[in-house]
């Protein structure tokens, strides 16, 4: 009689990796999950790089297209590329050095170019230099809405609960709050594209007891500690590149990632795996999230975030969402209409970077839900005359 999780494959089981944890290739009912192969019973399953399905620790999967196309043979993005649509070609990364980004040939964004079909191949209508090839006609069209968007992310693991002789990071599991505390960061990113600390609600600072500025008391310890939240720092945090995969909601133009109330993507990894992080209810809390996405501004995009703890969203390097501090789930949205375009310095047709910074700083619930509406870009469609 088959017993899922015992390490032996007996029909109707299709796999058995000796556990009943879904998301690792073999489901909790011992069915094979898409994008994986399970060759040996009782052993971990492995992802299938090149099948066009983003699975496991893959950072991209363009369906096994040619080398040097942006997604490597090990399913990691190649330098200078972004791979945000599973199963489709990666595209060149726009150049952003302040203000509007500069579109580059191959990024799939038709800005100041005769055409751009998202690749650097010749003989497909749009050349490697983004010129329309002889005997072809290229039109700028709204890109066909993909089923998913896969946005690159970097998680950084901090020690929230000390274990195994480790030391807790000062900003983790220290403070409390009953709602958002705005003003922890300035209104613009620094030259490295990272948030700038204000110290407004610093522990021991002049505003700690100021209920107008800091209604929930101190929220941070120091600039030196804050500057490590989104910077790789040996011995303090462990970085993990990944993707946040947003699913299309019907034909609404909306894409949603919902991590639920137990969003702890580094459980079983980082300091937890090294035995230096004490778990809370079996989960690894104490991490930050850095997510970036390029978009051509059309004037009707909507972003909504719902979660905890600190969340800051910048567009064009300017602060658009400010729900910092320790708090339970808070929801905030921003519509990039006329009023917001002036505030953020956005011009229709130009390319900008969306940068989201998040921190989970207290064990318990962890909520993370991101909704992007209208952020799918235009591209070129070329046809033979």
Regions found by a protein language model. Give the residues of each.
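Cysteine-rich modules of extracellular adhesion/ECM and protease-associated proteins
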Residues: 1-145
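Acidic/polar, compositionally biased interaction segments
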Residues: 119, 141-385
